[in-house]
Curated annotation (Swiss-Prot):
It comes from Shewanella halifaxensis (strain HAW-EB4). It catalyses: cytidine + H2O + H(+) = uridine + NH4(+); 2'-deoxycytidine + H2O + H(+) = 2'-deoxyuridine + NH4(+). GO terms for biological process: cytidine deamination. PROSITE patterns: CYT_DCMP_DEAMINASES_1, CYT_DCMP_DEAMINASES_2. The gene is cdd. This is Cytidine deaminase.
């Protein structure tokens, strides 16, 4: 079991703790599939909703909050029945808008894993306005069920009435809808090819700046992030932050980064290079490779 989960395990009921320990091996990064979840439910003798709330301390152990020192965990449950954990990330010395909220982390985890619908968000405190707006960008976002300790399960619309969202800007394919943007570049570099693939899957209906980041560690492992825009603009999730969140979930230290690539579309009305460089340089001493590509 990874050391980062030791304190969290102590907070779980003993039957659940015993059942989940085998999952928390060196490769665990916050994903529990539907079959594993069923095993945990049987072992713990908990109702599903009770179990999901009980697992929040495990999600919170994924957090890296050097500024607030406040660990927040969130879980996104997909239509597949799988659950995806996420946690808050803060970048040392950088402005607070560089932070990743736990709900963003969990949702991006589900998105990168191929989920097309998120049905439930489980979190240990009421989602902030920023996160409510981010959830609202999803397919059927207003219907996503919000689970909070000691509170009735309510749809997002309960927490965000009279919402402004993608439909108000005539967007008919919101976040989690499969994106297919063709970006071409003649390269045989596996890392650049990976970044191109993820940029083509990014969500940028408002600026058309389809973009992604791929980070490589010294052992050759890669961690990706896609740009995820929001109708309210500010809650948009930057690809660098998503990639760093992915690294954190996999228990990698940011000092292990030895290469970083940002790919973005030449047709976008903005550029993410400045924000990406600021975020990267707060955690690693490595130059950002910035590649602008033509969309087909």
């Amino acid at each position: 079991m990874q050391d980062r989960f030791l304190k969290s395990i102590a907070k779980l009921p003993e039957p659940l703790a015993t059942a989940i320990v085998p999952l928390l091996d060196k490769d665990f990064a916050g994903h529990i599939d539907a079959q594993q979840l069923e095993v945990l439910q049987i072992a713990s003798k908990m109702e599903l909703n009770e179990l999901l709330l009980a697992l929040l301390p495990i999600a919170a152990a994924l957090a890296r909050p050097p500024i607030s020192e406040f660990h927040v965990g969130a879980i996104a449950k997909g239509k597949s029945g799988d659950i995806y954990m996420g946690a808050n990330i803060e970048l040392p010395g950088e402005a607070l808008f560089h932070s990743v909220h736990a709900e963003q982390s969990a949702i991006s985890h589900a998105w990168l894993s191929g989920e097309s619908i998120i049905e439930d968000i489980i979190v240990n405190a009421s989602p902030c306005g920023h996160c409510r707006q981010f959830i609202n960008e999803l397919v059927d976002g207003s219907k996503v069920k919000i689970h909070l300790p000691a509170q009735k399960i309510e749809p997002l619309a309960h927490y965000l009435p009279y919402a402004f969202g993608p439909s108000d800007l005539n967007i008919t394919e919101p976040l989690l809808t499969k994106q297919q943007h063709t970006l071409t570049l003649d390269s045989n570099d596996p890392m650049i090819i990976e970044a191109l693939d993820h940029a083509g899957l990014s969500y940028a209906p408002y600026t058309k700046n389809y973009a992604s980041v791929v980070l490589e560690t010294k052992d050759g492992a890669t961690y990706c992030g896609r740009y995820a825009e929001n109708a309210a603009f500010n809650p948009s999730m930057q690809p660098m932050q998503m990639a760093l969140s992915t690294m954190a979930r996999h228990n990698r230290d940011f000092s292990e980064i030895n290469r970083a690539v940002l790919i973005e579309s030449s047709k976008g009305v903005i550029s993410l290079v400045g924000a990406a460089m600021d975020a990267l340089h707060s955690v690693a001493v490595v130059e950002l490779e910035h590649i602008v590509v033509e969309p087909e």
